[in-house]
């Protein structure tokens, strides 16, 4: 079984995107990440959930913590904003084949439960954690808050 490091995006004073009715990305990210962490643990994986409450962790510390913990895989949970729909997984330029395969497998699973397919995308802005972790890594953008 794998050691999987899960990061619920944003937290604390950093709400991330804010949607209709004040819905905050940080709250959804924590809820989704916690649910996935529970499922992965039940399947026999060892999981480290970066935060389990509403506080902010610096991106440099997130990458450092995942690396020091010795994770086999890193997954960050976020939400999109800007008036679209669907889910996408992000990887960085030069991502490993395993990162690409993991992102594609997650993307396929999201589409399988009803998300519109926005694909696996290469993104190099605001990706400090993905580019500074030593294990295969992806960010999941789980739909839009708005």
Show where each model-derived region lies.
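Active-site-proximal helix/loop segments of hydrolytic enzymes
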Residues: 2-3, 27-146
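Short, surface-exposed beta-strand segments enriched in small/polar/acidic residues
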Residues: 4-17
